[in-house]
């Protein structure tokens, strides 16, 4: 029994130690990272806070009903001195003690500011702030997704580069062996052998550096997903053939639909509403109030008679002079409104500029990819032909090395253009998903 238990335990521990997270697409990785990102969690909490502020603002304009209970034990009843002329004696005063030892007063009272226009405006402002918080949370998510996409596709590019480097290392190893064979047969001198070895060492060093870059890119993905660096993360997707985004470019024509523009526009509305609210504070407060109370006094706790009292009334209150505070508040709110409008105009201008830049970058990247893909294909074909000629002693090593250098340059250019394409693609798709 113990042996079986230990076997099961070892299998469980082995499974736990080799557990890993695997993602097949960017969307799957992004969903996981967004779900676990602390900034996104804080944005969700801020949204809930604004919702509570909205509910609180509603409560501020509703009637207030209070219940009270007062029990007083008059250890020494207060004495009232009444001066006067008593029994023909002037400058005489009499002392009286009023009340009982115990005084009990339960009751209810209610009040309602029926002309709280500023409070009603604050409800509308709080509702708008709640919408802004929701949009801001979406904006944070979109910005994070852009960062995630940049890091994700950067990792895919490092993996693609590794494939090129591994292939180049295999090629240089083949050249090194061919040169060594020729050297033994007396067909080439030591210089050519050493040059093939040098190229092979360069490729080996490049492989080591490329692997380090890939590891760093993978660690960055772990950090963005809020994973410990010791966690095993596997991305199975590879760089795909670029697809046309012409249908998505239409979204770049209307900058007002961008989340940044929506947030800026809502802030203008809130600033305008704040200005209105400050102006409404000039109106007088009109309060309705009412109360209903019971009172009982006695020298000991007993079933004494209860006396009732109730009242209703209307109270109108306004500030005649308050040091100009209301005027200053209105002016400050108006300046904030003007500032918010400037921010909106600036946001729309920047979005328009960014949209046009994205459009041009996309068109250029598509054209460049078409050319570098053809260049890479030709360079690979040229190297195949040159290697064949070199193997058959038709082409000298210097010319083979030149063709090989052209292939390396074509590979590098291809990766650079693919990287530029995905950078533009991520930004455009982030806008489309808004």
Task: For every predicted segment, state its role.
Residues 1-30, 34, 419-421, 428-429, ...:
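Bacterial Sec-dependent N-terminal signal peptides
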Residues 205-227, 377-434:
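Short segments within alpha-helical structural elements
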Residues 21, 68-108, 112, 236-245, ...:
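Small/polar, glycine/serine/threonine/aspartate-rich low-complexity segments that form flexible
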Residues 28, 52, 137, 141-255, ...:
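Periplasmic alpha-helical coiled-coil/stalk elements that build and connect Gram-negative outer-membrane
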Residues 19-70, 76, 225, 229-269, ...:
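Bacterial Sec-pathway N-terminal export signals of envelope proteins
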Residues 41-45, 58-59, 101, 114-141, ...:
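Sec/SRP-type N-terminal targeting helices
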């Amino acid at each position: 029994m113990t042996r079986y238990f230990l076997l099961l335990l070892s299998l469980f521990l082995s499974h736990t130690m080799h557990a890993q997270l695997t993602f097949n697409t960017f969307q799957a990785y992004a969903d996981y990272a967004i779900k676990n990102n602390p900034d996104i969690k804080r944005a969700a909490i801020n949204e809930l806070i604004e919702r509570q502020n909205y509910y609180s603002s509603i409560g501020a304009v509703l009637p207030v009903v209070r219940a009270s209970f007062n029990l007083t034990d008059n250890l020494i009843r207060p004495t009232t001195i009444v001066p006067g002329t008593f029994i023909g004696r002037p400058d005489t005063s009499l002392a009286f003690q009023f009340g009982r030892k115990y005084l009990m007063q339960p009751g209810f009272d209610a009040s309602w500011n029926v002309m709280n226009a500023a409070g009603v405006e604050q409800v509308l402002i709080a509702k708008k702030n709640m919408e802004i918080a929701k949009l801001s949370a979406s904006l944070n998510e979109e910005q994070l997704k852009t960062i995630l996409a940049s890091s994700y596709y950067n990792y895919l590019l490092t993996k693609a580069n590794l494939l090129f480097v591994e292939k180049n290392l295999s090629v240089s190893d083949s050249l090194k062996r061919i040169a060594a064979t020729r050297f033994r047969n007396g067909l080439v001198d030591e210089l050519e052998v050493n040059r093939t070895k040098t190229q092979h060492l360069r490729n080996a060093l490049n492989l080591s550096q490329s692997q380090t870059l890939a590891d760093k890119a993978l660690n960055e993905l772990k950090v963005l997903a809020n994973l410990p660096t010791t966690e095993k993360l596997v991305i199975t997707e590879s760089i795909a053939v670029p697809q046309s985004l012409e249908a998505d470019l239409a979204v770049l024509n209307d900058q007002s639909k961008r989340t940044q523009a929506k947030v800026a526009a809502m802030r203008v509305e809130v600033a305008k509403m704040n200005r209105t609210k400050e102006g409404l504070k000039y109106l007088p407060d009109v309060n309705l109030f009412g109360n209903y109370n019971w009172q009982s006094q006695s020298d000991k706790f007993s079933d004494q008679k209860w006396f009732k009292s109730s009242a209703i009334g209307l109270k109108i209150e306004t500030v005649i002079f308050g040091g100009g505070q209301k005027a200053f508040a209105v002016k400050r709110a108006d300046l904030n409104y003007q500032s918010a409008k400037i921010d909106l105009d600036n946001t729309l201008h920047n979005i328009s500029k960014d949209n046009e830049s994205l459009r041009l970058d996309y068109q250029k990247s598509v054209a460049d990819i078409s050319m570098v893909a053809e260049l890479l294909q030709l360079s690979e074909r040229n190297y195949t032909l040159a290697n064949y000629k070199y193997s058959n002693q038709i082409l000298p090593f210097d010319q083979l090395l030149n063709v090989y250098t052209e292939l390396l340059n074509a590979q590098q250019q291809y990766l650079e253009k693919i990287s530029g394409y995905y950078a533009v693609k991520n930004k455009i798709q982030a806008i489309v998903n808004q």
